[in-house]
């Protein structure tokens, strides 16, 4: 039995999702009494300049680089085994070896497709369990390697795709994608309506604009929706202060119809009272929406994992996908007026949700490693390579 195992969680700052999942798992380990948990941005620490450039290109994929990202995502999927694996497997290897030497972890978890660990394991024969936590509702082969001991996936659909390409079924556990604990708690909705000055008597449309301008034409969208009777529009701008200031000027025209917010730590509060939400189809955002059964309108998904996520949720009846700017107002308005459709989407979201994924993942890992744990009661947060 391993007493007080040391856990190393490797992640990357491409969007906020991978890091958020890493932190959620860290908290789940702490909840089980495992305090020695290290979260490391391996690529950022190993190659900061290259990482900054690729992060910039990643963000540009939302605006001017969609075709480039399409080529990268689907191209790498096709040629991965032949040309990319050798280079990518060594990316971050020097920093990784230093980490393993100094920290001597008992368990390694990836929340980003980092194959340096399983590749090093393959080449050197060192013995350490490696776990991959997939953060989308689709599969990219870059996550797959013979030396990964266990995969945690969002859905049975992803599991079946992995089995089809040769991953042993016993290595795959369907847990859902880890989400923040706030999204799994119950809360008094009346307090939320009062806090954000929202009306229970009106439909509420939540627009998650984000910090990087990933939703275009937000101002025009808001102006259009402000004219819809019995509708309140709540816009979360994140850390995009320029967008926030622009929308605050628009809010002055009708502060009852439009509510503008910057970064909101407990965004789950708005999820709980919204009728539907316009957002981008990131795996974590969709998991959070599923937890609270929020119907989603997925706006112009970027080719790659976003598009695959959108296709999955649309196929399940949980999302409406908008691919043209001209469609968004009318389709959103029509959905808001269709209570039956909204209810069907909420039920579809509920069927996708898997409860307490982080705790499930941690339990499996600790049980497999015969780890001794001390359960710590959780305080509720205040409202505020390949097998083929």
From Swiss-Prot:
It holds the Pfam family Glyco_tran_28_C. GO terms for cellular component: plasma membrane. Keywords: Carbohydrate metabolism, Cell membrane, Glycosyltransferase, Lipid biosynthesis, Lipid metabolism, Membrane, Transferase. Gene3D superfamilies: Glycogen Phosphorylase B. The keyword Nuclease does not apply. Its EC number is 2.4.1.315. GO terms for molecular function: 1,2-diacylglycerol 3-glucosyltransferase activity. It is found in: Cell membrane. Its main location: membrane. The keyword Repeat does not apply. This is Processive diacylglycerol beta-glucosyltransferase. The lineage of its organism: Bacteria, Bacillati, Bacillota, Bacilli, Bacillales.
């Amino acid at each position: 039995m391993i007493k007080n195992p040391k856990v190393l969680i490797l992640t990357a700052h491409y969007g906020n999702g991978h890091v958020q999942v890493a932190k959620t798992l860290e908290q789940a380990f702490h909840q089980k009494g495992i305090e020695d948990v290290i979260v490391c941005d391996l690529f950022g620490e190993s190659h900061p300049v290259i990482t900054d450039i690729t992060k910039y290109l990643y963000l540009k994929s939302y605006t001017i680089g969609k075709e480039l990202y399409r080529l990268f995502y689907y191209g790498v999927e096709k040629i991965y085994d032949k040309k990319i694996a050798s280079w990518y497997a060594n990316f971050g290897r020097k920093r990784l070896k230093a980490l393993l030497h100094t920290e001597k972890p008992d368990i390694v978890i990836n929340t980003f497709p980092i194959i340096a660990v399983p590749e090093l394991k393959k080449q050197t024969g060192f013995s350490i369990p490696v776990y991959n936590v997939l953060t989308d509702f689709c599969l990219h082969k870059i996550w797959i390697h013979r030396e990964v001991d266990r995969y945690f996936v969002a859905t049975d659909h992803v599991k079946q795709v992995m089995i089809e390409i040769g991953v042993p079924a016993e290595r795959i556990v369907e847990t859902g994608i880890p989400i923040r604990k706030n999204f799994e708690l119950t809360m008094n909705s009346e307090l939320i309506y009062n806090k954000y000055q929202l009306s229970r008597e009106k439909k509420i449309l939540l627009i998650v604009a984000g910090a990087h301008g990933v939703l275009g034409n937000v101002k025009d969208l808001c102006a259009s929706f402000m004219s819809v009777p019995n509708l309140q529009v709540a816009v979360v701008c994140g850390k995009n202060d320029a967008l926030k200031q622009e929308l605050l000027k628009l809010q002055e025209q009708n502060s009852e119809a439009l509510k503008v917010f910057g970064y909101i730590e407990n965004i789950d509060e708005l999820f709980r009272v919204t009728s539907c939400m316009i957002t981008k189809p990131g795996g974590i955002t969709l998991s959070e929406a599923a937890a609270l059964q929020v119907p989603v309108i997925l706006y112009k998904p970027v080719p790659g994992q976003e598009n695959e996520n959108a296709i999955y949720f649309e196929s399940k009846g949980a999302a409406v996908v908008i691919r043209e700017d001209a469609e968004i107002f009318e389709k959103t308005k029509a959905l808001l007026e269709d209570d039956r459709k909204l209810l069907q989407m909420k039920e579809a979201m509920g069927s996708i949700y898997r409860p307490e994924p982080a705790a499930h993942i941690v339990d499996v890992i600790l049980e497999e490693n015969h780890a001794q744990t001390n359960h710590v009661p959780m305080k509720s947060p205040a409202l505020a390579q390949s097998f083929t």
